[in-house]
Amino acid sequence: MMLNEPLRICGTEVKNRIVVPPMSDFGTVAPDGLVHQSHIDRYEAYAKGGAGLVIVEACSVLRMPENRDTLCLENDDCIPGMKRLTDVIHRYSAVALVQIMLTGLSTMKENRIDEITRTDFLRYKDAFVSAALRCQTAGFDGIELHAAHGMYLDEVIETSERKDEYGGCFENRIRLLAELITEIKKTCGKDFIVAVRFGNPNYEELLKTAGAIQAAGGDLLDVSSGMGRYLDVPSGFPYDGKIYAASLVKAHTKLPVVCVGNIFTGDEGEAILKEGLADMIAVGRGSLADPAWARKTLAGETPNPCLRCKICMWYIYGALCPRRLSK
């Protein structure tokens, strides 16, 4: 069973190919942006549930009014709580990453990327590197840069028209992401995993982004998309469009690729791996409905299935998830 095969990422062995992707529960984040017991309980359930890689939900590198519903890594106050997360994830032999991000400027209702002062632009950049170092201090095996779903790094890559070296042509727009990868590696060491979640509705730029991540020293490609921007998927492709994007990246890179998108059964995940479309599968809603999805799937058991609500109720507020309520 390919799902149960180990995989090495930057020298770290992941015990199987199942990933719990970063998923925020906006009903549990406290105003202080710090880890609380509800987070510990949730991530312990995922790790105990058998996934090889657990990626902690998006954490902001700076505290801003627009990301008040996220965990925050702005200062060292975050380290004790984040250490509690790594402890419970590692307790069950899972690899622990944390997704770090800054909210997109369109969400922040501030100026466009090209209107940010150079001082602020470089301050944001430094905040990512500092956050990565705090995550390493807390015991994480690595970080994931969130460069998808309209977040700040995604906006820079896709829309920056700055007049300096970070805007205009693709080579300039990708520069910030590439420099972040290089600087985080320099700061945290070559064995610290740097993953990137990214996507692009432009086929050529999707592949060029993957190549730039690899060239900069990135270790893992987590392909996703959202905000209504998707690649055109050929008729007859049997899986989600995000998996199609991952398959294109997989065919053009040497780095391991994670795919995500409507993977609800072990048979689906196994088929994706056997067809060579990705190296790992991320199971989001399935893990929300049953945190033991990985363990049960690998044991040949049937997990409690996600009910596939049109709008994910767990995402809105976890206590409202009908699958959780039905237990």
Feature roles, as predicted:
Residues 1-327:
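Flavin-dependent oxidoreductase catalytic cores
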